[in-house]
């Protein structure tokens, strides 16, 4: 059974992602989420704290998904493991909830540096580290793997992610992501 904090975040998630920070109040989260105000305020004294908590929670859920990804199969080659990792990552980041969170982060993150920091430290920094480890397993020098990992992530997300953020969905996007991932893997291991 989930702890109370997780229950609150699950209840608040659709409200915050639908209405954003400006359109959300803690009172409405309590009412729509079926949570007592006292419990909500005990765990999250402000909507900014709730938003930051939600960002951390979503990053944690995505990390758990990556840990169960086929890339964990050490019998596969590092290149295949990297491709698997990038497929899971791109699939997660183009989910509607992640796109909504990212849009909110871009719109409001500058006012809430803690949220931006959580997203970076609990999300993308960990992803880059995991990818750097896969690159190192394939022969990329440890001194270079961090930089190359950032490049690999950027290439894998590419134009497809930018279109998804803007709400542009086109036939063939899945093929475009597959091509971007292939190019990212090729780039990553060309740095040996």
Language model segments and positions:
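Helix-turn-helix
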Residues: 7, 15-49, 53
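Hydrophobic/aromatic-rich alpha-helical bundle segments in the mid-to-C-terminal region
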Residues: 136-184
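C-terminal alpha-helix
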Residues: 15, 134, 180-192
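Generic hydrophobic, amphipathic alpha-helix propensity
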Residues: 4-13, 29, 54-58, 62, ...
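Hydrophobic alpha-helical connector segments
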Residues: 53, 66-102, 145-152
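Short loop-to-helix capping motifs
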Residues: 46, 108-113, 158
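Short, flexible, glycine-rich and Lys/Arg-enriched loop motifs at helix boundaries
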Residues: 57-76, 164-177
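Amphipathic alpha-helical packing segments from all-alpha helical-bundle domains
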Residues: 80, 93-100, 104, 113-140, ...
